[in-house]
């Protein structure tokens, strides 16, 4: 019995060797058709172009959503009129991404300036395990203020 156990253990031990082979690199493949844009002008406050793969949902004249079902993403847009309250709107826009600071590893900012059209803004990339990975605001500093998040 002792020899049988020893020989069985030896056979199992020697038969469990395998040659290690390197695994090929895997890449994420996202196939989306070429983007085709259409104008969105249903709100009196602002207009923009969006991809026709998105579905637009209008909650009211100030809030709307762009839903991309194939990408499982939603872009939330919130419009505010500027009425001598640009400071408070900017403070709120800067506070919003930093609500995720407990889950975020970092929140780099990217400033957007288009002096020809008078549009200014900031894009916040929330790196880490946060509910909203990208947040931004755009304004002309006079009449319009748009906040968005993905």
Regions found by a protein language model. Give the residues of each.
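N-terminal targeting sequences that direct proteins away from the cytosol to non-cytosolic compartments
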Residues: 16-73, 81-90, 99, 105-116, ...
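Short, Gly/Ser/Thr-enriched beta-strand-loop segments that form substrate-interacting elements
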Residues: 119-135
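Short, hydrophobic/aromatic-rich beta-strand segments within well-structured domains
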Residues: 136-138, 147-148
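Sec-dependent bacterial lipoprotein signal peptides
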Residues: 1-17
